[in-house]
Structures are given as structure tokens and as C-alpha cells.
């Protein structure tokens, strides 16, 4: 079922995220700059394979992890956008899958153990696995929005600073 997703930038950490409503909850999937570069590279490889007609039609773990299985991200979730108190760190993998003879680029975010332990006893233990599917046009739009130039422009507008990068320690 098609869903709307929003991209956002966290200026304090230079991280970006995707927010989506999925299975009765809102989820923020947050990536650091290294993972943004990893996703950009995977998007580019997918578009190249798509254009060269190298995509494999048979669904398998291989195609679902074709462009990487070692990504790390933060997931925050809750039933109301303004109250996403649950969070955890997890892995994601990048690939593609055919649905009704059409290929979709996929970001599969594994379930995350909830590390917000101070919220009481009525708290979800973990998030659900999130499967995001993108058409070729959506992949191109995401590539444009993930571009360093676009992120620099957004970062400058939010902070007044010309340097989009985080401190390394």
C-alpha cells in the first residue's frame, strides 16, 4: 500500500531521516552521513542495474540485500508524531524486489530493541521490521534530496552555518 514519507534534517548532529506511518505507528529512521553516502551509492548502483536490465526477477535474500546488508540506523517510534518516546539502534539492508512485474528499490530496516527503559511497564519491547519500497522516479527524487548540495542548503537555512558536517571525536 503506498505511503507518504517525509525527509528531515537534524542540524545538531547533521543526520537525516525518513518519517513514515507504518502499521499504526509513526517511525523516524535516522541515518548519519556515512550511511547517507552508503544509501546514495546503493541508489546509484540500482539505477545503473535498472537501466542496463540486470535486475533479477526472482525474489530472494540476494536481491533484497543486493546493495548492502551492513547499514546502521536509529529508529524512533510512537503512535503520535509528537510522542515518539521509543527508540533503538538497528541494522538495515538495501536491495530490490519485484511486485506485479515492477521493480522497487527497498530499504529493509530490521526491528530495533527499545532502549527507552525509563518509560514504565507498558512499553513496546521492540519496533517492527520496516520495509520501504521506492519506484525508479522516487529513487531519483531521494537521490536529489540526499545530495550533499541539497543537505548543505537545508543545513545553512536552519543554522546559518555554511559547514554541513558533524564533529568527530
Where are these regions (language model features)?
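Positively charged, low-complexity terminal tracts
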Residues: 1-169
Amino acid at each position: 500500500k503506498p505511503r507518504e514519507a517525509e525527509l528531515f534534517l537534524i542540524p545538531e548532529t547533521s543526520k537525516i531521516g525518513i518519517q513514515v506511518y507504518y502499521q499504526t505507528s509513526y517511525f523516524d529512521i535516522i541515518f548519519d552521513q556515512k550511511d547517507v553516502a552508503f544509501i546514495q551509492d546503493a541508489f546509484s548502483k540500482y539505477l545503473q542495474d535498472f537501466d542496463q536490465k540486470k535486475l533479477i526477477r526472482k525474489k530472494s535474500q540476494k536481491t533484497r540485500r543486493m546493495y548492502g546488508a551492513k547499514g546502521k540506523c536509529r529508529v524512533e517510534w510512537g503512535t503520535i508524531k509528537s510522542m515518539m518516546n521509543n527508540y533503538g539502534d538497528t541494522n538495515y539492508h538495501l536491495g530490490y524486489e519485484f511486485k506485479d512485474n515492477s521493480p522497487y528499490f527497498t530499504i529493509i530496516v530490521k526491528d530495533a530493541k527499545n532502549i527507552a527503559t525509563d518509560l514504565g511497564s507498558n512499553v513496546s519491547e521492540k519496533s517492527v521490521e520496516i520495509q520501504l519500497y521506492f519506484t525508479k522516479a522516487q529513487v531519483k527524487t531521494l537521490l536529489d534530496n540526499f545530495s550533499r548540495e541539497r543537505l548543505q542548503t537545508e543545513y545553512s537555512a536552519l543554522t546559518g552555518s555554511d559547514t554541513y558536517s558533524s564533529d568527530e571525536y
